Amino acid sequence: MLSALRYDDPRYTVNPVSGEEDQTAELGYVITGWPVLDAHARYLYARKADISRLIKPSEAYFPDEAAMQEGSPQQSLDRGDYRTLPPMLILQGDSDDNIPLTIPERFVETYRDKGGSVDIAYFPGMPHAFAQQAGPSTDRAIGLMKEFLAQNV
């Protein structure tokens, strides 16, 4: 998400864009499934719920909570330090126990308030990373992605 919101921030660009000098890594659209939209809020949730499978990787990836806040797409929106708001589709299982659903709800509300276009599709009874398995929900997710691409490419 940070690469979408802050495509030219050197902290989130590892590889240079090849081609013409005036090319950028700005994205024309984003499709994301069960994203980490607020790393710090997710970490606090995981600590409160004692979910070690989320706590340990967060602490390994981020040096401290300040870095979690800095690396949070939600907080980037709140701070206003984003560069662009590409059209976005979020696929989210409503039984994802990695986050409370208030996190994507808040992100969508803020994204729209800032002028961005975002659609969120909830999948009843589906857990985190649900679309990695074949089934009706995955079929629905693929259909939504196709529709989104047809409208945005």
Segments (PLM) and residue ranges:
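Alpha/beta-hydrolase superfamily serine-hydrolase fold, recognizing
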Residues: 1-153
